[in-house]
Amino acid sequence: MATPINANELELQDKVVHINRVAKVVKGGRRFSFSALVVVGDGNGYVGVGLGKANEVPEAIRKGGDQAKKNLFKVPLVGTTIPHEVLGHFGAGWVLLKPAGEGTGVIAGGTVRAVLEAAGIRNVLTKCQGSRNPHNVLKATVAGLKRLRSADDAARARGKQAGELGGA
């Protein structure tokens, strides 16, 4: 099992991706509550996502940030991009992430962009298909990032040295 990541040791920036207002109809009218999708990252390979729910927006954002800090994980980076192409699925949505050359920038929609920038990825190409719901896109992006493997990890899994693997 991997060692847990201590959020207090990292300088995390948080970004609100989506705020949703939900109405519950009661005898006296409507009761509103809010949910907030929050992404936190240190811009250097660590990122986490969380969903907070509360009766007030600031409280929902705080709860989402706290949950995101509990869900931190490390993304392998190669310079300012990702090591290889990867596909992330969640529900009916999927996100394709492709490494890009220096100077390309983050070619992504708002939800995917927030996660990639929080992780410190500066050059990447993406494509979202299927569900465009922010919850599904966010979780599909995270699923894709969790599937990434560095060249060292791939070589170790095959019992070889990183230089022995083919490719770029």
Curated annotation (Swiss-Prot):
Domain of life, source organism: Bacteria
GO CC terms of this entry: small ribosomal subunit
Residues of the S5 DRBM domain: 12-75
Keyword annotations from UniProtKB, A to Z: Ribonucleoprotein, Ribosomal protein, RNA-binding, rRNA-binding
A Pfam family assignment: Ribosomal_S5
Example GO BP: translation
InterPro entries, per the entry: Ribosomal_Su5_D2-typ_SF (IPR020568), Ribosomal_uS5 (IPR000851), Ribosomal_uS5_bac-type (IPR005712), Ribosomal_uS5_C (IPR005324), Ribosomal_uS5_N (IPR013810), Ribosomal_uS5_N_CS (IPR018192), Ribsml_uS5_D2-typ_fold_subgr (IPR014721)
Molecular function via GO: rRNA binding; structural constituent of ribosome
Swiss-Prot/TrEMBL domain comment: The N-terminal domain interacts with the head of the 30S subunit; the C-terminal domain interacts with the body and contacts protein S4. The interaction surface between S4 and S5 is involved in control of translational fidelity.
Record HAMAP family: Ribosomal_uS5_B
Function in brief: With S4 and S12 plays an important role in translational accuracy.
Family, as annotated: Belongs to the universal ribosomal protein uS5 family.
Subunit-level organization: Part of the 30S ribosomal subunit. Contacts proteins S4 and S8.
Protein's name according to its UniProt entry: Small ribosomal subunit protein uS5
Underlying gene: rpsE
